[in-house]
Curated annotation (Swiss-Prot):
PANTHER family associated with the record: CYTOCHROME B_B6 PROTEIN-RELATED, HEME EXPORTER PROTEIN C
Protein's recorded name: Heme exporter protein C
Subcellular location: Cell inner membrane
Membrane topology note: Multi-pass membrane protein
Pfam families named in the record: Cytochrom_C_asm
One of the GO biological process terms: glycolipid biosynthetic process
Transmembrane segments: 26-46, 66-86, 97-117, 131-151, 162-182, 204-224
Alphabetical UniProt keywords: Cell inner membrane, Cell membrane, Cytochrome c-type biogenesis, Membrane, Transmembrane, Transmembrane helix, Transport
Xref: NCBIfam families: ccmC (TIGR01191)
Function: Required for the export of heme to the periplasm for the biogenesis of c-type cytochromes.
Lineage: Bacteria, Pseudomonadati, Pseudomonadota, Gammaproteobacteria, Pseudomonadales
One term of GO molecular function: heme binding
Similarity remark: Belongs to the CcmC/CycZ/HelC family.
Source species: Pseudomonas aeruginosa (strain ATCC 15692 / DSM 22644 / CIP 104116 / JCM 14847 / LMG 12228 / 1C / PRS 101 / PAO1)
Gene Ontology CC entries for this record: plasma membrane
Length: 252
């Protein structure tokens, strides 16, 4: 029988703050090592593409950002559902803290895609199905951020953001399968679970390292933001006051 103790413990802001403090350094170090390794390998040592030459190297930023942008939104939807069903405050904190990170990753994916598209397609932007769906994803992130800031009541804001996150998740399969459902300029998926990558190993391995690095970076950034938000929300409790006092004394 599965042990759900950890899930119930997540409902405790104090427990989350303590356990996340142990995870944070590991994610931060892993992110730094993986991103530096992937960048140096991919940008300096990976062979050029036989068609696109060195312009393809932007893939080492574009693909990880696009992966993370979509994964982050799925996480928002899951956290939103947990918050609505189990009334778990940490889930609401996760939604509020992850949305800006996801928005930035979506923006980076769109920006690098535009830079890559100029030499490849001859245009900075085309109303391609996948590009349009990614733009909608950015607006969904903006909507969640705006709702969280516009609604003064914290519980009402959490519910509104959760509903938007859950409804908007329908856009994720559209992004993923748009290249299969419609005729698009965008290339098929770089990685699939069932098929070996078409590019040689010296090109896709640094890309995989970058993807893992971006996920570790996301985890580290999310934990930092959530820990600060938890301290803010629990500022009247004894444990939060003690933690803030310890942090202030440590900073001196």
């Amino acid at each position: 029988m599965m042990n759900w103790t950890w899930f119930h413990k997540l409902g405790s802001p104090k427990w989350f703050y303590e356990i996340s403090g142990r995870w944070l350094p590991w994610f931060a170090v892993a992110a730094a090592l993986l991103i530096v390794t992937g960048c140096v390998w991919g940008l300096a040592f990976a062979p050029p593409d036989y068609q696109q030459g060195n312009s393809f190297r932007i893939i080492y930023i574009h693909v990880p950002a696009a992966f993370l942008a979509q994964s982050c939104y799925v996480m928002l939807a899951v956290a939103g559902a947990v918050g609505l069903i189990w009334k778990m405050k940490i889930a609401d904190v996760a939604v509020q803290c992850a949305a800006p990170i996801g928005a930035w990753m979506t923006f980076v994916a769109l920006l690098t895609g535009a830079v890559w598209g100029k030499p490849t397609w001859g245009a900075w932007w085309v109303w391609d199905a996948r590009l349009t769906a990614m733009l909608i994803l950015l607006f969904l992130y903006f909507g969640i951020i705006a709702l969280g800031q516009a609604i003064s009541n914290r519980d009402s804001a959490a519910k509104a953001c959760a509903v938007l996150a859950i409804v908007g998740v329908v856009n994720i399969p559209i992004i993923k399968y748009s290249v299969e459902w419609w005729n698009t300029l965008h290339q098929p998926a770089t990685f699939t679970i069932t098929e070996k990558p078409a590019m040689p190993v010296e090109m896709w391995l640094p890309l995989l390292i970058m993807v893992l690095g971006f996920y570790c970076f996301f985890a580290a950034m999310l934990l930092v933001r959530m820990r600060l938000e938890v301290l803010k929300r629990e500022s009247r409790t004894a444990w939060a006051k003690a933690e803030v006092k310890a942090l202030v004394e440590k900073a001196r």
